[in-house]
From Swiss-Prot:
Alphabetized UniProt keyword annotations: ATP synthesis, Cell inner membrane, Cell membrane, CF(1), Hydrogen ion transport, Ion transport, Membrane, Transport
Protein name: ATP synthase subunit delta
Cited function: F(1)F(0) ATP synthase produces ATP from ADP in the presence of a proton or sodium gradient. F-type ATPases consist of two structural domains, F(1) containing the extramembraneous catalytic core and F(0) containing the membrane proton channel, linked together by a central stalk and a peripheral stalk. During catalysis, ATP synthesis in the catalytic domain of F(1) is coupled via a rotary mechanism of the central stalk subunits to proton translocation. This protein is part of the stalk that links CF(0) to CF(1). It either transmits conformational changes from CF(0) to CF(1) or is implicated in proton conduction.
Pfam families: OSCP
Alphabetized Gene3D superfamilies for the sequence: N-terminal domain of the delta subunit of the F1F0-ATP synthase (1.10.520.20)
Keyword Transport annotated: yes
Subcellular location: Cell inner membrane
The keyword Cell inner membrane is annotated on this UniProt entry: yes
GO molecular function: proton-transporting ATP synthase activity, rotational mechanism
Mode of membrane association: Peripheral membrane protein
Family assignment from sequence similarity: Belongs to the ATPase delta chain family.
One GO cellular component term noted in the UniProt record for this chain: plasma membrane
Lineage, highest ranks first: Bacteria, Pseudomonadati, Campylobacterota, Epsilonproteobacteria, Campylobacterales
Main location: membrane
Name of the gene encoding the protein in the UniProt record: atpH
Organism annotation: Campylobacter curvus (strain 525.92)
Amino acid sequence: MNEVVAKKYVKAILSDVNSAQLAKFISNLSEISAAFEIEKFRNIISLPTLKNSAKAEFILSLVQDPSENFKNFIKLLGANKRLSLIPAILNEIKSEQTLLDNIYHGSVYGNFELNGEQLSALEDKFSKRFDAKVKLGGSKSDYNGIKVELDDLGVEASFSMDRLKTQMSEYILKAI
């Protein structure tokens, strides 16, 4: 439910700002969203005795030099009792920005560490394949092989050592 409402706010934001303003908007939302990690802050925002306008002003005090659009946006969220949606709006606006910039993030899993050179080679190959900028982050896991996941593109490529061994065994048995 929150994601649906957040998408509507993001759509309105994107229709009203240019790319430079969008970067500032995301920066401001990131500052506020970081505050939502603190339990006391969430308690203050959810206090029913505190007026929504006071909550909006409190949130705006966390941001240095907010634009008029940003002030109006936070006041609108406060008036509609939707200030708790700020982290969801930030996540949604970041994903929309990556779509606009044609940048996709993914992960590489394997039972060994990939160095920066190997990661950049994979990024280049996937970038050419999908005609988009691909950024990959590597992590070591228990997966016996290598797996590349690009969630935004809906792509998963993997090479499993166990599967290779099984297929080779089957091929040898068929040949006999």
